[in-house]
Amino acid sequence: MFSRAGVAGLSAWTLQPQWIQVRNMATLKDITRRLKSIKNIQKITKSMKMVAAAKYARAERELKPARIYGLGSLALYEKADIKGPEDKKKHLLIGVSSDRGLCGAIHSSIAKQMKSEVATLTAAGKEVMLVGVGDKIRGILYRTHSDQFLVAFKEVGRKPPTFGDASVIALELLNSGYEFDEGSIIFNKFRSVISYKTEEKPIFSLNTVASADSMSIYDDIDADVLQNYQEYNLANIIYYSLKESTTSEQSARMTAMDNASKNASEMIDKLTLTFNRTRQAVITKELIEIISGAAAL
């Protein structure tokens, strides 16, 4: 009754909408799966933001007294005009970060400045040794400067740093066997909840401080007293840098998680719109098929 051409044409016309419908249904499943995944990630980022906000509030509260001690210790080098001798070449470079990520450019900014300092000091003929406080800074620099690493410290940033932690780091540096003449400690200084600045502060060895011209006016200072004060001074500066770095890290993580949550919301809105449009297209095609079939009858 029907010709072969007519049957072939009818078969093609009948199968094409079914293929499109299957394709659209698969697309809807993919979109639904992506929406579910993004919503789960958004829950995680919001939770991490809340945790970071609580840790940031504590870190900022503890930073104020630590900053007083740190700036007081640094004032000694400034007021006494202590400088590293030009003929001495041993330099110690300390980078302060932590073991945890998801906090923006906190760790990479420290690594970038340390690499720049290493290049500058090496070009000036200095012998540079590195100390990494935190596993992140060690992971970044160890690939390119493994031969210059003196010591690296882990388990940093999981708990609020204490003066005891700074004392352990200072004691480890003094007992490392590397008799540096001067050094620098690089850390992120907290400025506001959305801002921090990578800073570098000087540190000096006991011999450098004792042989400074400005220290000669204090004839009655005992050598043991000066040694104890210098060790305490080093621990103070490390403690100050740890507190500054921790506060900067928590504020940066809070900002990063807030941005991630906002980006997730935007993606959810776009995918929801795409889902609705695709579903509407499927419904429209099904209605066209029904109407066309009814008209053919």
Curated annotation (Swiss-Prot):
The modification Phosphoserine is found at residue 146. GO terms for molecular function: proton-transporting ATP synthase activity, rotational mechanism. The modification N6-acetyllysine is found at residues 39, 55, 115, 154, 197. It is found in: Mitochondrion inner membrane. It is a peripheral membrane protein. Component of the ATP synthase complex composed at least of ATP5F1A/subunit alpha, ATP5F1B/subunit beta, ATP5MC1/subunit c (homooctomer), MT-ATP6/subunit a, MT-ATP8/subunit 8, ATP5ME/subunit e, ATP5MF/subunit f, ATP5MG/subunit g, ATP5MK/subunit k, ATP5MJ/subunit j, ATP5F1C/subunit gamma, ATP5F1D/subunit delta, ATP5F1E/subunit epsilon, ATP5PF/subunit F6, ATP5PB/subunit b, ATP5PD/subunit d, ATP5PO/subunit OSCP. Subunit gamma, of the mitochondrial membrane ATP synthase complex (F(1)F(0) ATP synthase or Complex V) that produces ATP from ADP in the presence of a proton gradient across the membrane which is generated by electron transport complexes of the respiratory chain. ATP synthase complex consist of a soluble F(1) head domain - the catalytic core - and a membrane F(1) domain - the membrane proton channel. These two domains are linked by a central stalk rotating inside the F(1) region and a stationary peripheral stalk. This is ATP synthase F(1) complex subunit gamma, mitochondrial. It comes from Pongo abelii (Sumatran orangutan). The gene is ATP5F1C.
